[in-house]
A protein has these predicted regions:
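Cell-envelope/extracellular polymer assembly enzymes that use nucleotide-activated donors
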Residues: 2-5, 33, 166
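Acidic helix N-cap motif at the loop->helix transition within catalytic regions
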Residues: 15-19, 43-51
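Glycine-rich, basic loop-to-helix element that forms the pyrophosphate-binding segment
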Residues: 58-74
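A conserved acidic beta->alpha catalytic loop
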Residues: 38-46, 86-87
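Short aromatic/hydrophobic "clamp" motif used to bind/position activated sugar donors
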Residues: 79
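Conserved donor NDP-sugar-binding/catalytic core segment of glycosyltransferases
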Residues: 91-119
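Short, acidic, metal-binding catalytic loop of nucleotide-sugar glycosyltransferases
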Residues: 22-31
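A short, conserved alpha-helix in the catalytic core of glycosyltransferases
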Residues: 149-153, 159-169
């Protein structure tokens, strides 16, 4: 059974970290790991992560740099990239591994926006349709990839925006 490395880039995310920190406690086990990569937070982000007992790596700012640094430090067979405001409450290790096995070397989850306003439900619907039809994913969708494939494709490009879309193309 493959091991999973969950990688979360952070930069001043204290206002949205609480929920993810609680959810990630369920992912602690002998095989898997959670790595937060901080790009120079000036708020309580680092303190919160360390108080929750998670691994924290310091990095230069820039999401691609942070994601790549976390990936290179990761020990898992599968890399799962999350955002600090991700909601993984409905994803179990078993369901994750089932999807990862079915998708092959990489994949993503449907986006779920917590705001129930109609406009956000419409946005989520169209983002999920686009991703399903084109296989182009955003980081909000929890991209996962085997570590060997990630290295083979050259990791995330060091660009300021859309590094997630570039990786999935």
């Amino acid at each position: 059974m493959p091991s999973i490395s969950i990688i979360v880039p952070v930069l001043n995310e204290a206002t949205c970290l609480d929920s993810l920190l609680v959810q990630l406690k369920d992912w602690r086990n002998d095989r898997d790991e959670v790595i937060f990569v901080d790009g120079g937070s000036e708020d309580a982000s680092r303190k919160m992560i360390l108080a929750a007992g998670f691994r924290l790596i310091k990095s230069e700012p820039g999401r691609a740099k942070q994601l790549n640094q976390g990936a290179m430090a990761a020990k898992g067979d599968v890399l799962w990239f999350l955002h600090a405001d991700s909601d993984i409450s409905e994803i179990s290790r078993e369901s994750f591994l089932s999807l990862a096995h079915n998708e092959g070397f990489w994949g993503f989850f449907k986006i779920k926006i917590s705001d129930k306003a109609l406009i956000f439900r419409i946005m989520a619907f169209f983002m999920n349709c686009r991703a399903s039809c084109t296989r182009v994913a955003t980081g909000d969708q929890g991209i996962f990839v085997s570590k060997s494939t990630f290295i083979e494709v050259g990791a995330y490009s060091d660009i300021k925006l859309m590094e997630d879309i570039e990786l999935s193309c």
